């Protein structure tokens, strides 16, 4: 993976990431394709209509169904899906915790039950990398020890120490596998933990960045804490992350979150919000959120957003989207998801242009002004 810093504006960064499958301009938002599919969208939508360069897929879900060995036999994620740009896969640790009625972590890894059939499984640092080697993703996230907030200092200390040990195991194993010709085009990111405690965040960041990872993520945020607490934690953490490697904030978030965290030095984001909210009738626009299921849109012949150039806004009206939603037509999910993702991706493109011009402060001010007008 090649990484270049193209421009900075205070802490905001415009960078370029080159994998073996695509060139990614940052700041970048990665649509979430949990089971190797962004819900309601196909590869043509993602590649040609939305022009994405990277999407996220989920290790836990693909391990359980159809199985990572099946994906490998079918050409890895790229051959399996026909999406020939970059994939980032997470470690599956979050899902092992959140979707299992019985899950527990120990020094070796995470034991959990499948949410599909109740079968028992065990994720170790090596196991999640083996799964991701089979998936053939461009960026692999290592196993980390997740902590629900609020957490005691004892639990945070355990999480940070365990995450560091697993990171050491992961990088050692990855180097060994690459020496055998496995995963040579795959990059590996570590995940900084520590909750909202600055002491533990610094400890985790310092220990992980001493290891030879290709990039670093901030994990364990956007789990119910106040926005200001999350922003402050990100602002505290990013200075301890290498300038010459990508910085990824996991599972975040709203358009406001992205604008604020770009300002604090983050390059990469992912979240289910744009597609999940689309399916539930909430549309993101340049002037804020729009509830497309509201009765007032029944006869509205305007596009969702006059300022939007997306496929949906160029071809369909609010009235039609309102009808599709109320009729539970499957077409609604596609058109609404295309719009919401286009909004997120365009926001990232505009943020990059502002950084390149040294005008991010003005961009941020205008972003909020449009929402208050």
Curated annotation (Swiss-Prot):
An example of a GO molecular function for this protein is: tRNA-guanosine(34) queuine transglycosylase activity
**Its GO biological process terms?**
queuosine biosynthetic process; tRNA-guanine transglycosylation
- Which catalytic residues are annotated? 90, 270
The portions of this protein that span the membrane are: none
Gene Ontology CC annotation, any one: cytosol
How the cofactor is bound: the record states: Binds 1 zinc ion per subunit.
Pathway the protein acts in = tRNA modification; tRNA-queuosine biosynthesis
Q: Where does Zn(2+) bind?
A: 308, 310, 313, 339
| Superkingdom of origin organism | Bacteria
Renumbered to this chain, region (RNA binding) spans 251-257, 275-279
User: Could you tell me what reaction this enzyme catalyses?
Assistant: 7-aminomethyl-7-carbaguanine + guanosine(34) in tRNA = 7-aminomethyl-7-carbaguanosine(34) in tRNA + guanine
Q: Which family does it belong to?
A: Belongs to the queuine tRNA-ribosyltransferase family.
Describe its assembly: Homodimer. Within each dimer, one monomer is responsible for RNA recognition and catalysis, while the other monomer binds to the replacement base PreQ1.
Protein name (database record) = Queuine tRNA-ribosyltransferase
Q: Which gene encodes it?
A: tgt
């Amino acid at each position: 993976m090649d990484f270049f810093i193209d421009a900075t504006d205070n802490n905001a960064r415009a960078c370029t990431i080159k994998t073996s499958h695509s060139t990614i301009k940052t700041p970048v938002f990665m649509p979430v394709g949990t089971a190797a599919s962004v819900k309601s969208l196909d590869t043509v939508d993602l590649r040609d209509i939305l022009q994405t360069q990277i999407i996220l897929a989920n290790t836990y879900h693909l391990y359980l169904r159809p199985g990572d060995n099946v994906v490998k036999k079918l050409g890895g994620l790229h051959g399996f899906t026909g999406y020939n740009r970059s994939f980032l896969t997470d470690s599956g640790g979050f899902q092992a915790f959140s979707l299992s009625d019985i899950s527990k972590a120990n020094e070796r890894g995470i034991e959990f039950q499948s949410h599909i059939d109740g079968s028992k499984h065990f994720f170790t640092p090596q196991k999640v990398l083996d799964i991701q080697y089979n998936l053939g993703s461009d960026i692999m996230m290592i196993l980390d020890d997740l902590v629900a907030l609020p957490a005691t200092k004892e639990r945070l200390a355990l999480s940070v120490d365990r995450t560091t040990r697993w990171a050491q195991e992961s990088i050692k194993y990855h180097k060994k596998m690459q020496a055998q010709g496995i995963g040579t085009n795959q990059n590996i990111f570590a995940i900084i933990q520590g909750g909202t405690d600055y002491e533990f965040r610094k400890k985790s960041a310092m220990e992980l960045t001493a290891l030879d990872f290709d990039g670093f993520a901030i994990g364990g945020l956007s789990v119910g804490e106040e926005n200001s607490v999350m922003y402050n934690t990100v602002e505290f953490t990013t200075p301890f992350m290498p300038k010459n490697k990508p910085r990824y904030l996991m599972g975040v978030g709203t358009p406001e979150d992205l604008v604020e965290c770009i300002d604090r030095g983050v390059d990469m984001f992912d979240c289910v919000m744009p597609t999940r909210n689309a399916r539930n009738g909430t549309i993101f626009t340049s002037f804020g959120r729009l509830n497309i299921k509201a009765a007032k849109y029944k006869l509205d012949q305007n596009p969702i957003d006059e300022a939007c150039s997306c496929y949906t806004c160029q071809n369909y009206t609010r009235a039609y989207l309102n009808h599709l939603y109320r009729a539970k037509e499957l077409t609604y999910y596609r058109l609404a998801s295309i719009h919401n993702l286009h909004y997120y991706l365009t926001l990232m493109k505009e943020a990059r242009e502002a950084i390149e011009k040294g005008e991010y402060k003005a961009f941020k001010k205008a972003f909020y002004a449009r929402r208050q007008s």
